[in-house]
Amino acid sequence: MLLCILLFAISGCKTYDYDYYGTISGTVLDYTDNSPIENATILMMPGSQTVQSGPDGNFIYDGLEEGQYTLSVQRSGYQSERKTVEVISGETVTTSIYLKQIPE
């Protein structure tokens, strides 16, 4: 009886085809010396999801539908930068975004 209940419950669960979604994996770097930039804010459009770059400059967006996305990157002391990437289902797009320091 318990087995029947479990099978019934499992059959009603949705499954997701993870190959349907793509990922953007990127690194924010200093234009001059290629050093990683920590705590840069990356805004993804369309949508309004933001993430912060880690100590190694890395960031990731996953579970994205196929299509074009524009990344707008900002960090205090640097000029903002935008980059458009194409997400393909089941794949990871790897990108680097270079920020130029604002002269003092």
Language model features: what each stretch is:
Residues 72-84:
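A short, solvent-exposed loop/turn motif at the edges and junctions
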Residues 47-58:
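Short, acidic Ser/Thr/Gly-rich low-complexity loop/linker segments typical of extracellular
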Residues 11-23, 96-98, 103:
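Beta-strand-rich domain onsets/edges
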Residues 1-12:
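Sec-dependent bacterial lipoprotein signal peptides
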Residues 59, 81-83, 93-95:
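Short strand-edge motifs at loop-to-beta-strand transitions and within beta-strands
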Residues 22-25, 31-46:
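Short, ordered, surface-exposed loop/turn motifs in non-cytosolic proteins
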Residues 60-68, 76:
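Short Pro-Gly-centered beta-turn/loop motif in secreted/extracellular proteins
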